[in-house]
């Protein structure tokens, strides 16, 4: 029996390895190559798709491998399954774009335009962050190990960003912040 739940998860792992390799390549190049940054942004969106699937059903039968995958996704994407569980899995699939769904797409209007997109991202971002903090905090007393595990993912991401900023601030902005923000905004927008 394979450690992976599905053979197709090899594609996801290959994709994550390529995204990681692209980051390492760019970081080690002397200058910024815009086509590679654009590719990183596109791959950040794809990483979000993998994260979405991993939040619904983890890739591995083996818990330690799922933990490593969680940390890997956090480093590549900037958020983890901890943010998808309260906002998407436990909320969106429960309310399905009806009142109570924090991802309600027609909160302001049925029209598809830039203004509604900006409002959707701004309001959704506030709702998402609040839901994630409440979700993580809910484990503090009942399941402290889970609480610290979820918190460790956030801390790992911010330590990664902080170290990158200390080493090369411009590279941290272009190779970490830009693709991660693009990936999140593109995912929320689709």
Regions found by a protein language model. Give the residues of each.
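Active-site His/Glu-centered metal-binding helix of metallohydrolases
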Residues: 54-55
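Activation segment
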Residues: 58-59, 96
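Non-catalytic, topology-defining segments of multipass membrane proteins
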Residues: 1-46, 50, 67, 75-177
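Alpha-helical transmembrane anchor segments
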Residues: 171-190
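Post-HEXXH active-site segment of zinc metalloproteases
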Residues: 60-74
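Short, surface-exposed linear patches
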Residues: 71-72, 106-107, 185-187
